[in-house]
């Protein structure tokens, strides 16, 4: 691995990972170098105990004898939760440094206009702007009038063109699939070496790295990250998606090409079990909108969430508009709602999500012709319905 980084032109330091002097020197040396740096720390698992360099050291250090012998080697007190004096002193110095920087920041913040202070506070409290709901409703109304047949990935791009200029804290991106995921709105510029103000990140083919970095942004606060890839590739992002749920952060995962209707890529790209495992993940909202109206509503709910990540599953293929009558209420926030009521005595209820909703409506028409009263329920989010 070390030679691999060297061959790529990186600045590489190989050090004893247990030597604080070497660690400090390597960090200082890396800071002075204008190349990307990799510090390779050679270490021993369970250093200082009888379990050193064995598999036992991976999970057995809660053993009292091992703890006592390790502390003895280090010269530490046998008291529980003992913090060595030199370590405590170092942390106290770091705290003083942080306090100085914090006070300086607070003075700068106090000089801002009340409007900027309020907007900053809004972003960090994860409140959506008051104007967002009205803008989304205008979009929904236009869709109900025009009734386009578009893929929901395109619908997502359309509503992002409404959302992103209003919510300037959003940071978008894609794992090398921007043109397919439709995650870049027209107002966004790319974040790169020459443009640090860009709000769109080309992550490359790094789904897990993208998801992990988005989680970091969400944990920092003040930013609302979202990123896209194919639904099938949730496999690669799964660890970070799961951690987002565990950490209760509202990262938004845009997963397009959500069914066998994805096109010519074939079985390797066809999601089969992926929707089920996303829905099975606790504290995760999975949206599968049926048209542009539901897509807009899904985004609205996802952005209003403060402690739950969202998966927005979108189609490659075009879908007809099924919500033809405009309603200002966000019906998708209920999780499910009656899209078409049965005519006559109700005998059948068809429940569907995403691209299957229009199929359910077609089936309803046929059943009604045969005299079977059929209701169609659209269920864009099972988790919200179950609440």
Regions found by a protein language model. Give the residues of each.
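Thiamine diphosphate
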Residues: 14, 89, 93-313, 318, ...
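Glycine-rich ThDP/TPP pyrophosphate-binding loop and its adjacent helix/strand module
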Residues: 1-93, 283-387
């Amino acid at each position: 691995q070390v030679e691999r980084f060297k061959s790529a032109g990186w600045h590489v330091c190989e050090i004893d990972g247990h030597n604080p002097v070497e660690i400090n020197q390597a960090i200082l040396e890396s800071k002075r170098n204008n190349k990307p740096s990799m510090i390779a720390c050679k270490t021993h698992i369970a250093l200082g105990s009888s379990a050193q360099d064995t598999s036992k050291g991976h999970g057995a250090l809660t053993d009292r004898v091992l703890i006592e012998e390790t502390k003895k080697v280090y010269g530490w007190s046998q008291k529980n939760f003992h913090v060595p004096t030199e370590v405590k002193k170092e942390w106290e110095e770091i705290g003083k440094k942080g306090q100085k920087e914090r006070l300086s920041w607070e003075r700068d913040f106090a000089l801002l206009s009340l409007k900027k202070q309020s907007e900053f506070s809004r972003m960090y409290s994860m409140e959506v702007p008051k104007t967002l709901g009205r803008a989304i409703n205008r979009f929904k109304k236009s869709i109900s009038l025009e009734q386009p047949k578009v893929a929901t990935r395109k619908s997502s791009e359309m509503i992002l063109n409404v959302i992103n200029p209003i919510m300037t804290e959003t940071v978008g991106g894609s794992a090398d699939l921007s043109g397919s995921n439709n995650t870049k709105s027209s107002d966004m510029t790319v974040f790169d070496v020459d443009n640090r103000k860009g709000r769109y990140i080309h992550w490359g083919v790094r789904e897990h790295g993208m998801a992990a970095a988005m989680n970091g942004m969400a944990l920092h606060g003040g930013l609302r990250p979202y990123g896209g890839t194919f639904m099938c590739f949730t496999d690669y992002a799964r660890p970070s998606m799961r951690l987002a749920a565990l950490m209760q952060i509202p990262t938004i995962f845009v997963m397009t090409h959500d069914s066998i209707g994805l096109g010519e890529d074939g079985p390797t790209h066809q999601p089969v079990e992926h929707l089920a495992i996303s829905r099975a993940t606790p504290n995760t909202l999975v949206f599968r909108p049926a048209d542009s109206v539901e897509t807009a509503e899904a985004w609205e709910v996802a952005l209003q969430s403060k402690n739950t990540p969202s998966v927005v599953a979108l189609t490659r293929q075009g879908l007809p508009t099924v919500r033809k009558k405009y309603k200002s209420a966000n019906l998708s926030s209920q999780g499910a709602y009656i899209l078409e009521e049965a005519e006559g005595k109700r005998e059948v209820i068809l429940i569907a999500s995403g691209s299957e909703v229009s199929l359910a409506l077609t089936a309803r028409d046929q059943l009604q012709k045969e005299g079977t009263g059929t209701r169609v329920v659209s269920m864009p989010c099972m988790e919200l319905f179950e609440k």
